[in-house]
């Protein structure tokens, strides 16, 4: 087995381990990189790709691997009297230089995605690098500044200090707050405090309104004041026996904790998803939304949020359930719509005629109610806990929806523009979901997790001189037909009749953007959803063939004729959505795989699929 193959094998084993940290394996990785220093570019590239694809709990371990290797390269270069100012590629100094190039990107990635408890450990790495003179002082100062800002924004709030804000002190000057009251930091985060969660359940359960006469006619189980045990409410939450006892003893006065009082929460936490009208929800739904946002703000995982909500509100129905567990509140599909819960995350059955994806039904056959208020359901929060945009817009034409793009088109991308540098430039405005560069066409596509971050980035980075080029940032189209988009604002108004089955599936099941599990309702505005490559043809791909092609009837669209310039169509064959709307070659065919890339609707064949991006150089 070659050194690089063994190296990658150890990284794979770390990825599937519990913490991603093993002293013996990190030592083995370091020894392999030192023994094969002539291949340092491949080793550092493997570390880079592993760190990008690693789970959030393993980001710290990836930095430990980088630290061990880069300092070993540094020591080797010093012993051989190699120059750090003019490094040679196949040498220790060359390996140190390549590792230094990816450090900023990997540390920034860990700051954004790793648990807040890991941030102090990353700060200690900076101290180690300073003592060993591993990196220049200005580089370390920049990393420290980012770390301290992140630690200040995620400082945990003490339940005890929140109960007496007038006596709270903050010697370090970076405590958290609830509403307008300052609170001192504590060593125990709220998300791991089972007693606090139980008190929140009790407070909201006792604040629930008395059901009306119409509601009393339906037999429902009594609403408990507090969950019977921590394990019953949150099965995966680690709880010490003493904590559970304290939770039972403290449940007698649940309202003594002002952290979870509904009257205080809206001062700093939205009372519902963006754009939702508070007057259209009843008291119980308002309490559910408030509690859900409180738990999400404390980084409680979505699965545990559902468990807590069910314990606090016996009549609570989760806004979205996995396939096989419950039903998504979708309108009754017609025979041509063929949208079922069991197929939301799997390949759909082929059309009975030719195996080509079914066309969406015409407006007259849609079983979507004309007036379905958002209050009928709460959109599922995004994986990072933020509420989704799901708002009614009276300016939207009938039987249409408005989609806010999160995709930016980047022009002027020469080979001097490297992915980590470009990513760090945009990460000043918010988290970058994915980034694809195509140096052959001198452009790229970048998707932000949130629309507001994309708006800031588009304005600030519209024309930015960089090296031998000028980076131009404009709005791109990541979802829906091109002709429906206003490229000056990044907003599309899409008639529902133009949405294909694949479009509808992505709108409902996307982790970011979309409806969050709610039905597709005319007149709503939402953010661009993530898509899955290879799960059916999209309206965007159809629009590339022209408006007339997108408007054809279902029977003609599902005909047996092959695409223009394409291979013959075989029964049951799946068609990929190929090309970007800015690509000069629309006949580019993606690789014959079914990769999942939630960041972009169209994957360029020159780049790997998924979140993993190549390092700033290509190993020879």
UniProtKB/Swiss-Prot annotation:
Gene Ontology BP term (one): termination of RNA polymerase II transcription
List each copy of the CID domain by range.
1-151
Quaternary arrangement and interactors, per the entry? Interacts with rpb7.
Keyword Nucleotide-binding recorded: no
Q: Which UniProt keywords apply?
A: Nucleus, Phosphoprotein, RNA-binding
Q: Where is this chain compositionally biased, Low complexity type?
A: 361-374
RRM domain span: 406-478
A molecular function annotated in GO for this UniProt entry is: chromatin-protein adaptor activity
Where in the sequence is Phosphoserine found? 343
Q: What is this protein called?
A: Rpb7-binding protein seb1
Signal peptide, first to last residue: none
Q: What does this protein do?
A: Involved in the processing of pol II transcripts.
Q: Where is this region: Disordered?
A: 151-191, 327-398, 558-620
* Pfam families assigned to the protein according to its UniProt record, in alphabetical order: CID, Nrd1-Seb1_dom2, RRM_1
